[in-house]
Amino acid sequence: GSRLSEETIDKPKPMVEVGLKPIIWHIMKLYSYYGFNEFIICAGYKSSYIKSYFNEYMMNLHDITFDFKKNLKTYHKKKVDPWNVTIVDTGLNTNTGGRIKKIKNFLGDDDNFFMTYGDGVGDINIKKLLDNHLKSNKIGTVTAVLPKAKYGTLNFNLKGKLDSFKEKPQGEGGWVNGGFFVLNKKIFKYIENDRTIFEHEPLNSLAKKNQLNVYFHKDFWQSMDTLRDKNYLNQLLENNKADWQVWEKNKK
């Protein structure tokens, strides 16, 4: 499928919508379901778009009354996401490692923090991911996932007869980085400057020093790199097969 270039002309990739909500919203809902509600967004390209979205979030979510006489506005929907969202402009051309370094002063007192890409969803159990990281006593934990193959596979026998056809089987391509990390603050020692690509020097250094733990996630995961990926996620939503929406599946 073609890249998301048309979608990202006027908005950053995490703001591309799946089911009328930005993909970053879906990611935040996953964390919130597991009780994690403090978010720091590393903004760069079109950062004002992200700021505007969250600035208007309450207004767009609720019925609202404007009292012009008293200069008041009242929201009329009871349930609100208990989120605390900090948006940090980390620069237009900063690489992934540099972006992480720029939010260092916004982190709380905990020794560890989550770091997640803004273009993929999954039904990752965030609490199990954290527990796995803490038990490892390592600086970083990466979630390994088994993406669906992009094409169906044909299996032939020795005589060239077609034995079976698998429609885009799960995990045919092997384990890949799913973009859901837990990091100890010691990671900042491994990030040199704005040009540091997190997936290169820092992660390779951790791996060489046996400081990179892996959490294996065998269930649903899907990145959104292309228009086809976006359409696939929307199709899953329409057919009530959005496995990443654990907050909907497990409503009491």
Residue ranges: model-predicted function:
Residues 23-27, 99-102, 202:
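Well-ordered alpha-helical segments embedded in enzymatic catalytic cores
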Residues 37-39, 112, 139-140, 211:
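Residues at the starts of beta-strands that form the adenosine-phosphate
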Residues 49-157:
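Conserved beta-loop-beta/alpha segment of the NTase-like Rossmann-fold superfamily
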Residues 9, 19, 36, 108-109, ...:
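Short conserved AdoMet
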Residues 1-52, 56-57, 87:
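N-terminal glycine-rich phosphate-binding loop and ensuing alpha1 helix
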Residues 15, 153-156, 203, 214:
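A structural signal for short hydrophobic beta-strand segments in well-ordered beta-sheet cores
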Residues 111-114, 121, 126-134, 146-149, ...:
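Catalytic-core segments of class I nucleotidyltransferases/pyrophosphorylases
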